[in-house]
């Protein structure tokens, strides 16, 4: 997995007994990219299997057969727009295919991190801005996965890291929703895209990650400050403030 992925994700894989191989953040065609390292490992280990989630059509099929119908059923068919991020593309493309079969008027919008090339490929049919680094995990790409079906999407919205991490913290503080930055990116995408529309819409937003996978990042004041996503003076009710029983008694006895 790429080195940008959180320690929580690495620890979870190790808990299941996996040997975790960390790859540098390099171009997709580089021999040390996670794409090529995984292919190399599979070629050398008898019986190894490469899920190839970026290009394996089964990825899209699963969401076409399960997630899409679930959304349609739970909304009773009253859905105007679906918004989500695209990493492998399986979730958004699979849901899009199913929902548009039920109602071609359903709009599919992809929220894309600033630094990803997908926005450019959709609107310009070419890469205008070279791939850049971003802290949001799981969505956005530096190449076009086979499972990102651009022809079935209806629009893209760009969201930067600051917006994503700010919203990640807001969602747990204001709504009690412990989700990750890719989910926050999707929500901001929905908010931005809906600003252009005058009539009320039923919008479904895909929250694809749990905040538990980002306790060391999005909910870590030190990491946020080090990555220029939080200023020291902004830290008031810190997520990382742990006090002793004696301190607590002393503090609350003053009130």
What are these regions (language model features)?
Residues 5-10, 85-96, 118-119, 182-190:
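Short glycine/serine/threonine-rich phosphate/pyrophosphate-binding segments
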Residues 1-41, 118-127, 144-145, 215-223:
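Active-site-proximal loop->helix
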Residues 34-36, 47, 101-181, 218-255:
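Active-site/ligand-binding loops adjacent to catalytic centers
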Residues 164, 187-196:
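A short, acidic, amphipathic alpha-helical segment used as a generic capping/interface helix at domain edges
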Residues 105, 201-202:
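Residues that mark the start of a beta-strand
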Residues 96-103, 194:
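Surface-exposed amphipathic alpha-helices with a cationic face
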Residues 55-58, 87-90, 112-117, 141-143, ...:
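Glycine-rich beta-alpha junction loops
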Residues 45-86, 94-97, 150, 154, ...:
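Active-site/ligand-binding-proximal alpha/beta "capping" segment
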